[in-house]
Swiss-Prot record:
Role: Catalyzes the conversion of dethiobiotin (DTB) to biotin by the insertion of a sulfur atom into dethiobiotin via a radical-based mechanism.
SUPFAM superfamilies, A to Z: Radical SAM enzymes (SSF102114)
Gene that this sequence comes from: bioB
Lineage, uppermost ranks: Bacteria, Pseudomonadati, Campylobacterota, Epsilonproteobacteria, Campylobacterales
Protein family: Belongs to the radical SAM superfamily. Biotin synthase family.
Protein name: Biotin synthase
Source domain of life: Bacteria
Domain called Radical SAM core: residue spans: 1-228
Gene Ontology terms for molecular function: 2 iron, 2 sulfur cluster binding; 4 iron, 4 sulfur cluster binding; biotin synthase activity; iron ion binding
EC number: 2.8.1.6
């Protein structure tokens, strides 16, 4: 019986991003009806961290909108990380703040951040079809920098953007070269406000993506994230049988997730336990 690791997301800043990622509701290039705000207060962030830990999460990811981790974001995320660590919540802290220099990443690590999340999103060859304002190489270099300063690396991406199987294999091979500790797996859900004209993945195709990810990344924490509820509904057991061993608990960046208690009950009904320690 395997233990399922739970991670919660805190959307520290929302919307207004100048990048043109075709899958992203936070891009200012598209008219998407989402909640927009500059920055949550430290009190709100700490309260979300407490709720996440009480719900069973071991990971807590601090996410900011925008292309990169500038000096102001570095200082604020560092302050938030210190507050959470000082509260003794025993959470594995992840920061997700875009492209970053080694100096900024080292500062986060010094202040209590354990891992950095920066998704490759898709294959290098396919990336120009979904984003023109920055390069895939910039993403890969940030992942390398996170590893170089001693942070854990969390990097994955989105299936169902219009890519084919050859691009999926290329993407998974690129992830393999980074040996990430954690790999978020998302399924794109079509949104009429975004420019991508694709259909949602069928369940079997989505499952094959998970099986391949597990084959390429046998020791990674494979974390199912956005799109699982839309693609699978309550019939999610095959995801875990295909190799998923971690779940994003609660809400996502701009969309609602299931209630944490419902997801935990569902996971246990499949015969799995909830992880009680990071390892």
């Amino acid at each position: 019986m395997k233990d399922i690791f739970l991670c919660s997301i805190c959307n520290v800043s929302s919307g207004g991003c100048a990048e043109d990622c075709a899958y992203c509701t936070q891009s200012a290039k598209y008219r998407v009806d989402i909640e927009k705000y500059k920055q949550k207060s430290l009190e709100n962030i700490l309260e979300e961290a407490r709720r996440a830990r009480a719900s069973g999460a071991l990971g807590f990811c601090l996410v900011t909108a925008g292309r990169s981790l500038d000096s102001a974001k570095t200082a604020y995320i560092s302050e938030a990380a210190r507050s959470i660590k000082e509260a003794g919540l025993e959470l594995h802290l992840i920061a997700c703040c875009g492209s970053a220099t080694k100096e900024a990443l080292a500062e986060l690590k010094k202040n209590g951040v354990d891992s950095y999340n920066h998704n490759l999103e898709t294959a290098k060859s396919f990336f120009p079809k979904i984003c023109t304002t920055h390069s895939w190489e910039e993403r890969y270099e940030t992942c390398e920098s996170a590893l170089e300063v001693g942070l854990g690396l969390c990097t994955g991406g989105i299936f169902g953007l219009g890519e084919g199987w050859s691009e999926r294999l290329e993407f998974l091979h690129a992830l393999q070269t980074l040996s990430p500790h954690s790999v978020p797996v998302n399924f794109y859900i079509p949104n009429p406000s975004l420019p991508l004209e694709v259909e949602a993945l069928a369940q079997e195709e989505a499952l094959e993506c998970v099986r391949l990810a597990r084959e390429y990344l046998p020791s990674a924490r494979l974390m199912i994230a956005g799109g699982r509820e839309k693609v699978f509904g309550q019939a999610q057991k095959p995801l875990f049988e295909a190799g998923i061993n971690a779940v994003v608990l609660g809400d996502y960046l701009t969309t609602k997730g299931n209630r944490p208690s419902e997801d935990i009950a569902m996971i246990r009904s499949f015969g799995f336990e909830i992880a009680e320690a990071c390892h």
